[in-house]
Amino acid sequence: MSNGTNIDVAGAINTLTETFGKLFQMQVDVANNSLKALAEVAEPLGKTATDLVASFANVATQVLQNVSSAVAPKK
């Protein structure tokens, strides 16, 4: 009969299920935190890139105006 080593199969399955659930939740949390961090980094980079493009456009416009006024015949 029994020698005192009963295996609690249901308990082991419950423990494994709980462990896998926690691992999955941790992966979801890591992915969520990574996305938040990327968004926090991308926002200032996007603003900086937009400002840089606007500055470049302003410089290009000023250069074209100066070239046009230098080339235009004087009255």
Curated annotation (Swiss-Prot):
GO biological process: photosynthesis
Statement: the UniProt record of this protein carries the keyword Repeat: yes
Gene Ontology molecular functions: bacteriochlorophyll binding
Keyword Hydrolase attached: no
GO cellular component, one term: chlorosome envelope
Major place of residence: other
Region (4 X approximate repeats): 8-61
Source species, domain of life: Bacteria
Per-repeat ranges for Sequence: 8-17, 29-39, 40-50, 51-61
Keywords: Bacteriochlorophyll, Chlorophyll, Chlorosome, Chromophore, Photosynthesis, Repeat
Family listed: Belongs to the CsmB/CsmF family.
Function statement: Component of the photosynthetic apparatus which may bind the chlorosome to the bacteriochlorophyll a protein monolayer.
Protein name in UniProt: Chlorosome envelope protein B
Species whose genome carries this gene: Prosthecochloris vibrioformis
